[in-house]
């Protein structure tokens, strides 16, 4: 959770920088540069533990305007996740990311998190973007 709050904080700060820099620059280039900077910093730490999870990957695809993170649970296999996991995780993901202007305005950017079990089987894929945040 700390990692995602860290990413959220960085994105919030970067979004303010984006607004000021975007006056003279193309917004997509500014967002891409900020995201790539964050990716570079976080990749130095991978793999590392975030509570019950291990961060496996962080990627920025500027062409697709996407931030992608991938993590796996340290102990749970697919059948060990609680039944309400998907509902709670989706609610928390949307709440955390839809506050960010990069994802709650029509920039075209999205953030995706892929959650895997201890065997690296996909448990859930979460996304936040303008369309999702507008609901």
Question: Residues of each region from the PLM?
Answer:
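Short, non-transmembrane alpha-helical segments in secretory-pathway proteins
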Residues: 37-39, 92
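Short, intrinsically disordered, charge-biased short linear motifs at domain edges
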Residues: 18, 82-88, 116-123
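N-terminal low-complexity, Pro/Thr/Ser-rich intrinsically disordered segments
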Residues: 22-36
């Amino acid at each position: 959770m700390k990692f995602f709050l860290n990413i959220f904080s960085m994105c919030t700060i970067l979004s303010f920088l984006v607004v000021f820099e975007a006056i003279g620059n193309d917004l997509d280039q500014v967002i891409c540069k900020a995201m790539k900077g964050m990716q570079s910093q976080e990749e130095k730490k991978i793999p590392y533990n975030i509570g019950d999870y291990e961060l496996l990957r962080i990627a920025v695809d500027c062409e697709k305007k996407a931030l992608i993170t991938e993590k796996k649970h340290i102990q749970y296999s697919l059948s060990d996740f609680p039944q309400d996991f998907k509902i709670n995780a989706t609610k928390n993901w949307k709440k955390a990311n839809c506050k960010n202007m990069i994802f709650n305005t029509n920039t075209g950017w999205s953030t995706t998190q892929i959650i895997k079990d201890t065997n690296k089987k996909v448990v859930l894929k979460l996304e936040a973007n303008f369309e999702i945040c507008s609901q």
